[in-house]
């Protein structure tokens, strides 16, 4: 009995497993990252190497030029060389002239600035010392007031000292640098027979956040039998420790009686 022949079915080709593909992709990624890093490092190394080679070549060119100059000056093997000694020596002389001109211009420039280059440090120290020696002081003259005021007003005069470290604000003197200060004031005033209470001069330390502090006080009681004004003066002065930003001012019992003729009424301070 004949049986029909049927060929065997082809075996299916084996497919690549997902884990193998994943490992291959990871390996490829790592390889590319390593290659990129290596390329960057190699480029950096090559750049540094080229910079170093440029320095070496520059030094080599200088050496060759000096060697040419030496040969031309000593006459060494002039017949066996193809050097144009006249051209080489002229170039060397030009370089010397440029260097000499630059070295001469530098002292002139420094001389124009006051010989600073040899004594720059000492001059700076001298300037600082002179700044420190400049007095910190101010002296003000009185200003007439026709109404009663709590704080006497003042003005600068052409003959009196002023300092940027002592500023004036509406009758008050403000110190910009802490330290010991001598504070003084004189007030001249007129008394009449009708006046019975003493005329009092006050010098206060201004305290914005609390009550003003009395530094000095002067009194004068002078009776007169005439109705005319008789001129009197009260003067106060003392040394006080002031902080940066402290302000002082002058007050009197009757500001309308103050005489502000030149030299009669003044207010000032200076740092010790």
UniProtKB/Swiss-Prot annotation:
InterPro entries registered for this protein in UniProt: CD40L, TNF_CS, TNF_dom, Tumour_necrosis_fac-like_dom
Taxonomic superkingdom: Eukaryota
Location(s) in or outside the cell: Cell membrane; Cell surface
The UniProt record lists the keyword Glycoprotein: yes
Keyword list, A-Z: Cell membrane, Cytokine, Disulfide bond, Glycoprotein, Membrane, Secreted, Signal-anchor, Transmembrane, Transmembrane helix
Glycosylation sites: 124, 146, 251
GO biological process, one term: cell surface receptor signaling pathway
Residues in the Extracellular compartment per record: 45-272
Cysteines engaged in disulfide bonds, as pairs: 190-229
TM spans (from-to): 24-44
Site feature (Cleavage) residues: 110-111
Xref: Pfam families: TNF (PF00229)
Topology Cytoplasmic: residue spans: 1-23
PTM description: The soluble form derives from the membrane form by proteolytic processing.
GO molecular function list: CD40 receptor binding; cytokine activity; tumor necrosis factor receptor binding
Membrane topology annotation: Single-pass type II membrane protein
Domain called THD: residue spans: 136-272
SMART domains named in the record: TNF
GO cellular-component term (any): plasma membrane
CDD domains assigned to the protein according to its UniProt record, in alphabetical order: TNF (cd00184)
Family note: Belongs to the tumor necrosis factor family.
Subunit structure: Homotrimer. Interacts with CD28. CD40 ligand, soluble form: Exists as either a monomer or a homotrimer. Forms a ternary complex between CD40 and integrins for CD40-CD40LG signaling.
Described function: Cytokine that acts as a ligand to CD40/TNFRSF5. Costimulates T-cell proliferation and cytokine production. Induces the activation of NF-kappa-B. Mediates B-cell proliferation in the absence of co-stimulus as well as IgE production in the presence of IL4. Involved in immunoglobulin class switching.
Designated name of the protein: CD40 ligand
Protein's organism: Gallus gallus
């Amino acid at each position: 009995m004949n049986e029909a022949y049927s060929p065997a079915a082809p075996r299916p080709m084996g497919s690549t497993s997902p884990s193998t593909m994943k490992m291959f992709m990871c390996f490829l990624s790592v390889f590319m990252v390593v290659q990129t890093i290596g390329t960057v490092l190699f480029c950096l190394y090559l750049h540094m190497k080229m910079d170093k080679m440029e320095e070496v070549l520059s030094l080599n060119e200088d050496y060759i030029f000096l060697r040419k100059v030496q040969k031309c000056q000593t006459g060494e093997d002039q017949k066996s060389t193809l050097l144009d000694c006249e051209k080489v020596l002229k170039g060397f002389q030009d370089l010397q002239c440029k260097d000499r001109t630059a070295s001469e211009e530098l002292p002139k420039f420094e001389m124009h600035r006051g010989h600073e280059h040899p004594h720059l440090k000492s001059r700076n120290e001298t300037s600082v010392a002179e700044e420190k020696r400049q007095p910190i002081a101010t002296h003000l003259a009185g200003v007439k007031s026709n109404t009663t005021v709590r704080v006497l007003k003042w003005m600068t005069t052409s003959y009196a000292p002023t300092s940027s470290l002592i500023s004036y604000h509406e009758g008050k003197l403000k110190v910009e640098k802490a330290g010991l200060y001598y504070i003084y004031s004189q007030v001249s005033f007129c008394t009449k027979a009708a006046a019975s209470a003493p005329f009092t001069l006050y010098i206060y330390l201004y305290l914005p956040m609390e009550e003003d502090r009395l530094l000095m006080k002067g009194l004068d009681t002078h009776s007169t039998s005439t109705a005319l004004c008789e001129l009197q003066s009260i003067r106060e002065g003392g040394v006080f420790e002031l902080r940066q930003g402290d302000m002082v001012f002058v007050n009197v019992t009757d500001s309308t009686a103050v005489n502000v003729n030149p030299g009669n009424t003044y207010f000032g301070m200076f740092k010790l």
